[in-house]
């Protein structure tokens, strides 16, 4: 009660007194809790939202239960600890998407992922995948603001963040699988 819920999509009136949306035609755009009960899952993108251990949270892309080719610019993700992950196309015609093939989130050239938390973020580790023998780490062309990026095989390490938010960008200007950033899991570590 008292919460603000914004849903994007067409609403119809069922039986004269119940607003509803067509399955798969609408999504939760935002949820602002004003101290009331949400009455359900307030996790855009669905799923578990990560496993907290000590001062870190581990997120597996497949655990969110997203459909194949799910467009992440539509709603982003909310983790169990309240951290949000939002995605932007960044000028690319293809925005970040989740694919069941490879169970990974694909970030195409110019795509961004912004991680925001109420806690200070120390580091982020993206565990990436291969596609037909090609390592999908954007050919090493990844930036973080704030943060320093180092790529080691299929692992992208973002360190020296020391902020409550960071934006990770696939800075590779080229197209093709080798220029995509595809991650299957992520570990966010917070400052103690």
PLM feature spans:
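A short beta-strand element within beta-rich, extracytoplasmic domains
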Residues: 119-132
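Extracellular beta-strand elements of beta-rich domains used
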Residues: 184-186
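Short beta-strands within extracellular/lumenal beta-sheet-rich domains
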Residues: 95-118, 153-154
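Extracellular carbohydrate-recognition regions
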Residues: 41-82
């Amino acid at each position: 009660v008292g919460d603000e819920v914004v849903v994007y999509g067409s609403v119809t009136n069922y039986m004269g007194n119940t607003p509803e949306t067509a399955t798969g035609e609408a999504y939760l755009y935002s949820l602002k809790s004003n101290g009331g009960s949400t009455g359900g899952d307030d996790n855009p993108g669905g799923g578990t939202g990560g496993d907290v251990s000590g001062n870190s949270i581990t997120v597996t892309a497949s655990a969110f239960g997203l459909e194949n080719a799910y467009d992440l610019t539509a709603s982003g993700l909310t983790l169990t600890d309240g951290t949000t992950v939002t995605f932007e196309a960044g000028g690319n015609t293809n925005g970040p998407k989740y694919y069941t093939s490879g169970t990974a989130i694909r970030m195409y050239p110019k795509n961004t992922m912004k991680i925001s938390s109420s806690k200070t973020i120390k580091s982020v580790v993206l565990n990436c995948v291969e596609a037909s023998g090609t390592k999908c780490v954007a050919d090493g062309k990844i930036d973080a603001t704030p943060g320093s990026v180092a790529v080691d095989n299929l692992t992208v390490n973002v360190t020296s963040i020391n902020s409550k938010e960071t934006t990770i960008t696939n800075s590779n200007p080229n197209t093709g699988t080798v220029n995509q950033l595809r991650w299957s899991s992520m570990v966010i570590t917070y400052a103690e």
